[in-house]
């Protein structure tokens, strides 16, 4: 098969499965509204859970940082790209989350890839929740370790894998909040099984940090768990981008020596680190935002209970409505868009076959009447 035939076949398969992805150009898509051209939509697809991408203090911190440090870092942190705002942010994150060290990465994808590939060897094994994020599963697949997956949120399934012999080390991988279902992992049971087997636990809490736990410390704090490796991202509740890995001192030093995604990537702009410090302060003091978000979640779930679609068992800002059929899911999303509501249709391979859904995400930036409007239109198009 030629290169062109391979490309054509792949595109044809996505079209035939009603799974073809397209990007939409917009003029702003965070917080409450999404603007595209002259059309404005209520935005129920953003991960900006607390609306901090539009926060005046966060924006001002970025502007002031850019005036002081410029708009780029100029290189890898191992060369000239590690500045005072980076060091300050790392220390603030470590103090807040109760770890000796934090290391900044340009994205959560890069952080997960770096940790899994740098820490594991051929005689090690990675035991990952079956529905872990693509960045985790891809990194585990490409790592030298053996990958085995346990049934989603099933500690007993994990235990069966832990019972099997391994000549090297075991790293168990899961998420605090899963991005497509919005459900939470039973972290205490998972950590108990992992520790009893002498393994380490990595938790990716991209969707829990900032919105769950005391002062927004996330899923691990909420469940009383402290994994050996905690990955947090800044593209959700923080309203920006980037990520960090929280760990012990020797692990941080090891990653600085061996994590290629860290060593060979240009560091985030110092101005971004300044903005992240401002976002962190707002999150630490943000019980009002978390309470407001929880009110919107409760309001939506109460109103959506009567819909003919299955509502996912989620207590978080991610509220999936399961449809099943790809074409029907796309059609529903288009009807919502025609009514001024931006809701994303999620289809395989992002979710398992037959798992197509409307992935609704809520934000503290939403007003109560926004939720009422969403429910009104959903009831209209689903009945």
Curated annotation (Swiss-Prot):
KW Transmembrane (keyword) present: no
Which SUPFAM superfamilies does this chain map to?
Answer: PLP-dependent transferases
Q: Where does this protein hold pyridoxal 5'-phosphate?
A: 108-109, 179, 207, 233
For the modification N6-(pyridoxal phosphate)lysine, which residues carry it? 236
- Keywords assigned by UniProt? Biotin biosynthesis, Pyridoxal phosphate, Transferase
Task: Say yes or no: keyword Transferase present.
Answer: yes
Q: Which GO terms describe its molecular function?
A: 8-amino-7-oxononanoate synthase activity; pyridoxal phosphate binding
Its UniProt pathway annotation is: Cofactor biosynthesis; biotin biosynthesis
Which NCBIfam families does UniProt cross-reference here? bioF
Q: Which PANTHER family match?
A: 8-AMINO-7-OXONONANOATE SYNTHASE, CLASS II AMINOTRANSFERASE/8-AMINO-7-OXONONANOATE SYNTHASE
This protein's name: 8-amino-7-oxononanoate synthase
Gene name linked to the record: bioF
